Amino acid sequence: MRPLFLIGLPGVGKSTIGRLVAERVELTFVDTDLFVESRYHASISSMVACCGIDKFRKRERAALLELLQAEDTLIATGGGLPIWEDNMDRMLANGLVVYLRSPLDLLAERLYTVRATRPAVAEKTHSEVRDYLESISEKREPYYSRAQVVVPIGHLRSAEEEREAAEQVIEAIRHHMEKEDA
């Protein structure tokens, strides 16, 4: 099976939902952020601080090019990966791209709660987190909207809600594959 890619804004649940989906349908799970950190023995924030965002994006792209060859793998991408160079084209050509989409207010609430673990929003107020998400959403939406599958994601406040979201993703993927086979 060709790779599945989960894309979406920060905080939408790509890693959380991705792990659950991969476990449920017996796929290997890869988070590109963790993959890049492991490969370069540094956190993303330290890579960006040291070498700049362009250098990080090049490393992220190299990881993507390697992962495009993966079989039976679900890949949760970094939020910005699809908009760099021709990454989205490559994902669409080599796998199934699933866009996890949530309302910005919901994402702002979620990100604000965990902001200490997210360098891009660590020092921001709730309002600034919302503004940040709106700004990056405007840039990324034209890329994200090209995904073959779009799944609306609601609250993820409990393990049960996370499992329900994972089931929604699985059903959306199944539905898409059935249409492709028809």
Locations of the language-model features?
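Hydrophobic anchor at the beta1->P-loop junction of P-loop NTPases
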Residues: 6
